[in-house]
Amino acid sequence: MKIIENFFDSKGLSSDSEEFIKLYNPSTGEEYAHVPKTTRNEFEKIIGKMKSAQSLWANTPITKRSDILFKFKVLIEKNFDLIAKIISEEHGKVFSDAKGSLQRGLEVVDFACGIPHLLKGNHSINVGTNVDLFDIKQPLGICAGITPFNFPAMVPMWMFPLSIACGNAFMLKPSEKVPQCSLKLAELMSEAGLPDNVLTVVNGDKNIVDLILQCEDISSVSFVGSTPVAKYIYTECSKTNKRVQALGGAKNHMLIMEDANLEDAVNGLIGAAFGSAGERCMATSVAMPVGNIQKPFMDLLKEKASKIKVGESLDPQSEMGPLITKEHKQKVLSYIEKGCLLYTSDAAD
């Protein structure tokens, strides 16, 4: 059985953990790999390496940092389909959705390449009697990112390129359900010339999350996931005075007025609700057609929803892939059971 590695010293390295999480292919249900629960000893060793790496990286000229990020951008473009395939295989997202999410992440890398301009400070003269004001932007130190299962490339790429561009070292903890994409991105960063241990990847579940939150050597944490976990992260990080950016789960509602274009409204809802199998933070979970448009809207929605081609993620004919796990599927089915009226059930099968 394939064992997923951690990433430090610019390469994938096996964990010494004896505890593992099983990984299953969402399309086939086949068990294909085991993810280690990184131990405290491993974590502390990696943090020690990152502290040394960060102090050197912070003194690297910003033009050099920008150059490495640009090379990383080029490597992503060269390996675009390969990375998208990894996303599809481990998450279940259809290939077109995988490529779209990767492109969104790549746009952030492109933005981070402009770091020489983004890090400029400010100077104000005579803000008070004989007082001038200067402000400068300096690295925080070691930053960490805890990312969700639904966007294995895009969300990590929101986080580490900008953090690293600013002179920080970055520890990435991907979802234990989708670890392989993060490892590939770290490998490409190393290939682009990033020094050892400026970017590391550690695997696990709540065990490694708690180590990150409690570590006094980590200065900031970015998180995307559920609202309860976001609240937990804010609470725990406050104990060690970390800066925190935690994006909790969101719910979108769609209101369809009587004068709306019926075709556009239904197409918009189909994309918003069923894109990426609905596994998006901003997926539309509630739609309210108003007045006389309700029946024609629901009839057209039923017609179009029943035609969505559900299949394996890499099947070119598939328009919607599977949910991430069988447990998640059961959760969604439980919502259907609580509903007042089921219009179509083809996709649920």
Protein language model features and the residues they cover:
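Structural signal for hydrophobic packing residues in well-ordered secondary-structure cores
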Residues: 54, 58, 73-80, 84, ...
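ALDH superfamily catalytic-core signature
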Residues: 228-345
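Hydrophobic heptad-repeat coiled-coil signature
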Residues: 171, 346-349
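Residue-level signal for inorganic ion chemistry
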Residues: 29, 65, 87, 167, ...
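Conserved C-terminal structural/oligomerization subdomain of aldehyde/semialdehyde dehydrogenase
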Residues: 26-34, 194, 218, 255, ...
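Rossmann-like NAD(P) dinucleotide-binding subdomain of oxidoreductase/dehydrogenase enzymes
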Residues: 121-264
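Hydrophobic face of alpha-helices
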Residues: 47, 66-69, 73, 84, ...
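N-terminal Rossmann-like NAD(P)+-binding subdomain of aldehyde/semialdehyde dehydrogenases
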Residues: 1-131, 324
